[in-house]
């Protein structure tokens, strides 16, 4: 059976003749049965039944209609008592089928919790130890100890904004006074350290001692001067070395050192000598090529040498640095500069540099073209002596010619690289010697 919603709204009785306010709960109605018309188009709504008067009420004009129950705003859920009717105010009859309004419970707002006091957040109070006196607590500890005995009213008074601001200012003043005292102590300590003749650093700040040697004790001497060389151009296959190979000797001047200490310094494996090429006067570094050439080095080969401790041709011990693999790309007159660096393994850290201990400059070296090259010289006694002791250096018999063109013909090319039995680059030395003998016989 279809039902319809009747929008008859009940209104609470007004006070003092004023119009009652609308109910916020929404529209209220009653379910009324309906019947259909014979044609089936529109439903016919049955009229509402007449209101039934309450029992015991008379038919006279003095009979008052029933009163509705007012909303009781009480925090409890039980319905409140009925409000007595006021004869002077207009009354509204209660419609049948409509129950009394449910009681509305107001929303209970939660009271915000009070922020804890400043003393609850404070950590353990600092203790000031002074010489000749016992430990003394700070003002914060005293305030926290006294705050436990105050009443709640006094505590609320202490938590007022004025008191908090004044206490914060007092704390700032205390911090400033502490900082000023610390800075005064630091400044007095720094002045005392400057005034003292010997200022000793604490053990944690002192650097660790490193076995570094004095740079003024080392000296370099060129024992074997370079004389001539053939320019090798910009290729890598037809390369000619400087003749004779430069040999540099390192000496140490230290009267207080014992012979064992001197041998230890001479055999130091981290002593390195670097070679660079300069102009004829020795004032300008010519390692870089001019702009019209390709970006290559002028001096090529092994530019760094390690120490070799042995005896020279006179039988004396020494520390030697040999450069048997040096070549020059362009012809001209140059000088070779040798720089000694003594590396200390204890100071090998990133960002540090090792100073140059000693330097030495060679005599003038002349680099010839292929046609003007006079030829190779025979190896010196010093070179042969070092070779016998195990030094990696080549031995040359040499074929120096005075007319030039030593490297032009095929025989000159063979003679300038004719090696004897001590040559490390050999392997074909005996064959070349046999060829040379056959050529001479013919």
From Swiss-Prot:
Disruption phenotype: Leads to reduced formation of conidia. Exhibits significantly reduced pathogenicity, developing only a few small necrotic lesions. Residues 433-442 have a biased composition (Basic residues). Residues 79-97 have a biased composition (Low complexity). Residues 1-192, 396-442 are annotated as: Disordered. Residues 401-411 have a biased composition (Gly residues). GO terms for biological process: sporulation resulting in formation of a cellular spore. Signal peptide: none annotated. Coiled coil: none annotated. Residues 45-54 have a biased composition (Pro residues). Keywords: Nucleus, Sporulation, Transcription, Transcription regulation, Virulence. One of its GO terms (cellular component) is nucleus. It comes from the Eukaryota. Residues 213-396 form the Velvet domain. The keyword Glycoprotein does not apply. It holds the Pfam family Velvet. It is found in: Nucleus. Velvet-domain-containing protein that acts as a positive regulator of sexual development. Plays an important role in pathogenicity through regulating positively appressorium-mediated penetration and invasive growth. This is Sexual development regulator VELC. It comes from Pyricularia oryzae (strain 70-15 / ATCC MYA-4617 / FGSC 8958) (Rice blast fungus). The gene is VELC.
């Amino acid at each position: 059976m279809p039902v319809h919603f009747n929008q008859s709204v009940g209104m609470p009785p007004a006070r003092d003749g004023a119009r009652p306010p609308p109910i916020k709960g929404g529209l209220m109605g009653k379910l009324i049965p309906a019947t259909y018309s014979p044609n089936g188009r529109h439903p016919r709504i049955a009229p509402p039944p007449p209101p039934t008067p309450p029992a015991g009420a008379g038919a006279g004009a003095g009979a008052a209609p029933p009163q509705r129950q007012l909303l009781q705003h009480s925090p409890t859920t039980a319905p409140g008592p009925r409000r007595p009717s006021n004869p002077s105010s207009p009354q509204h009859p209660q419609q049948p089928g409509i129950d009394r309004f449910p009681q509305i419970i107001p929303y209970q707002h939660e009271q915000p919790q009070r922020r804890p006091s400043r003393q609850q957040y404070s950590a353990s109070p600092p203790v000031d130890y002074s010489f000749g006196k016992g430990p003394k607590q700070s003002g914060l500890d005293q305030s926290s100890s006294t705050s436990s005995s105050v009443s709640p009213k006094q505590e609320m008074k202490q938590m007022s904004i004025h008191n908090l601001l004044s206490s914060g200012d007092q704390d700032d003043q205390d911090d400033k006074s502490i900082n000023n005292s610390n800075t005064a102590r630091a400044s007095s300590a720094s002045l005392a350290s400057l005034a003292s003749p010997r200022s000793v650093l604490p053990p944690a700040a002192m650097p660790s001692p490193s076995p570094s040697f004095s740079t003024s004790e080392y000296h370099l001497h060129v024992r074997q001067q370079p004389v001539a060389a053939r320019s090798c151009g910009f290729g890598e296959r037809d390369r000619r070395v400087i003749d004779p190979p430069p040999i540099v000797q390192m000496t140490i001047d230290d009267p207080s050192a014992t012979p064992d200490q001197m041998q230890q310094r001479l055999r130091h494996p981290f002593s390195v000598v670097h070679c660079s090429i300069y102009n004829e006067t020795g004032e300008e570094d010519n390692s870089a090529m001019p702009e019209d050439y390709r970006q290559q080095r002028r001096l090529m080969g092994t530019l760094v040498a390690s120490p070799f401790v042995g005896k020279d041709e006179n039988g004396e011990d020494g520390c030697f640095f040999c450069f048997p693999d040096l070549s020059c790309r362009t012809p001209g007159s140059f000088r070779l500069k040798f720089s000694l660096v003594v590396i200390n393994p204890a100071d090998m850290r990133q960002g540090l540099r090792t100073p140059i201990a000693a330097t030495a400059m060679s005599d003038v070296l002349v680099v010839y073209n292929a046609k003007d090259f006079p030829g190779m010289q025979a190896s010196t006694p010093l070179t042969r002596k070092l070779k016998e002791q195990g030094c990696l250096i080549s031995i040359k018999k040499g074929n120096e010619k005075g007319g030039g063109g030593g490297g032009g013909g095929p025989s000159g090319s063979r003679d300038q690289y004719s090696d004897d039995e001590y040559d490390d680059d050999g392997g074909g030395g005996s064959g070349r010697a046999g060829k040379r003998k056959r050529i001479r016989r013919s």
